[in-house]
Amino acid sequence: KELDRTIQVICRMEKNNPLHVGDPGVGKTALIYGLANLINKGQVPDRLKGATIYGMDMGQLLAGAQFRGDFEKRLKLILDGASKEKSILYLDEIHNIIGAGRGSDGGPDASNILKPYLESGAICFVGATTHEEYNRKMLKDGAVTRRFQTIDIKEPSVEEAIKIVTGLQPSLQKYHKVSYRKEALEYAVTASAKHISGRCLPDKAIDLLDEAGAYLEVHPVENRRRSWVTK
């Protein structure tokens, strides 16, 4: 339902920038992978068909920006390029844009640079942050926050988490060059829910599957044309 809500927000005329707010590990990034998968399959409204999702790394933009205006030029170059096509910019840990790039000379930070693009609607932005950082940082800049539509992301149930990791199955298989059986996906979710405390689904289940794939890369199964991850 969070993915459906995200798509619905993007289709709005105003405040069409979804902001995913939830505890670490509840699947905020997985939602973006799910959205990309639906766009790739064409299973989205016409407004989103053919759209390209880009992830924007604020740390890389800041790296090496030593002189006044360097960061602003870099960011505007990306935003101007993205506005020329049907783009969705994903900002993980979006709270970092507050104050990012602002030097002692009083130049504009990332949030101020983004405001005109948020207003114009030429680019759709999808942000993600935790409740703590949303309250601590995002709410301090009301001009940015009110241009986003907040979507509360809760920890999924076991059944929902199984669907999420199933959606990520192709990318995990492609990366590790292994195949994950359906039973392995289900076991990763149920076992992590039962035995791993202090963390949320689906993140802890994805970690188990990723670790299993890495193990088979280091310890390949001999005399098999393809390795299978089972429980």
Language-model-derived ranges and their functions:
Residues 1-231:
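AAA+ P-loop NTPase nucleotide-binding core of proteostasis motors
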